[in-house]
Every structure is written in C-alpha cells, then in structure tokens.
Amino acid sequence: MSLLIEQARYHLSAHNARQLPDDGGYEVAFAGRSNAGKSSALNALTRQNSLARVSKTPGRTQQLVFFQIQPERYLVDLPGYGYAKVPQDLQAHWQAFIDRYFRTREALRGLVVVMDIRHPLKDYDLQMLGYAAERGLPAHGLLTKADKLGRGQQMQTLQKVKKEVSSRFGDSVTVQTYSGESRQGVDELRGIVGGWLGLDVEPPADA
C-alpha cells in the first residue's frame, strides 16, 4: 500500500469547480492553517521531497491541487489558510468554492486536518472538521511538529484534542501525533489515508 501512495504525481490545479476532475473514484483532502506543515506532511506521506511545494509565504496554496496515485485515486491539497494579503472578493471565492467542494464532491472519502501540535483546534481547523461531519465523512487530525514538545506534553495535548473532537464530532474524527523531522507517525498516517483510498486492497483492474 505504501508503495502505491509513493506513486503520487501532480495531476492538475483547480481554481473553480469547472476545472475539477471527473467526480468518481476516491479522494482524500488535506487542509491546514498556514505553516502547520501540510505540504511537508504530503511529501513525507509519499516519500517525495517536492511533491507539494513548501512555501515560506503563508497561504501560498491558492487552488485545489490534485495529486494522482492511480486512475481515480487522488490526494487533494486544499488552499492554505493565510489570506491576509488576499483581496476580500478572492477570499469569498475560495470560501464558496471549498464549501461547494465539501457539500457536493462524491469522490471525497476523508479529510486530514493538519495542525501544529502547539496550536491545535483553531477556528479554521474546527470549520474543516465541521465540513466533514456535515457530510458524514471520516476526518483525521494530524498534530504536526510533535518533536517541538516533550513526550509527556505530546500525550497530554493528544488526549486533550481527542476529548475535544469527540465532544464536538463524536467518533468520526481520529487524532495522532506526527513529526516530519523524526518521521514519527508517518506509517499511521499512511494506514489511514490508504484505507480511505481503497489502497489496502487491490483496486479493480479497470480502475
């Protein structure tokens, strides 16, 4: 399964609904606030150093970026939340686009919300988890940069976040700690994402 995920390649970028791929198959979306480590997590997941561009400019991702693993198997990089330098009309466009994507996209099978373990469950994170809950989709909270905290602090934050998401969203959200520096949690993330994409079993020959 991990070898399949490593086959991910850039497919297309969508600025509006007309540019999205056909709505079939399996997609897993990744969302995260600026500098939460979303691009780095995608690169670690696929064992590629530059699949998702890592930018020092907050909110640089201004489109839905699709990475194809196999036909009808995609990882989707959602726009980073960092719109301070973006005009209000463009902010409104992205809000409407993402809202429509979550409400109508049949191929969407799960959502990974990437959060800095030192600053979890901000308003944007809860909004994204809420989108998944409204659709009845599973979500996974990825607490990144775990190496910045001691083991005890990691576990304390993990339990606190688990308790909070459980009270808000029930058992539809799972949570883990993760570090790109030490590769802590990469295999766990692969298992979650691979399961949602149907990569834990052989896909149909005509997929």
UniProtKB/Swiss-Prot annotation:
Keywords: Cell cycle, Cell division, GTP-binding, Magnesium, Metal-binding, Nucleotide-binding, Septation. SUPFAM superfamilies: P-loop containing nucleoside triphosphate hydrolases. The keyword Repeat does not apply. Disulfide bonds: none annotated. One of its GO terms (molecular function) is metal ion binding. Pfam families: MMR_HSR1. One of its GO terms (biological process) is division septum assembly. GO terms for cellular component: cytosol. PANTHER family: ENGB-TYPE G DOMAIN-CONTAINING PROTEIN (PTHR11649:SF13), MSS1/TRME-RELATED GTP-BINDING PROTEIN (PTHR11649). Necessary for normal cell division and for the maintenance of normal septation. This is Probable GTP-binding protein EngB. The gene is engB.
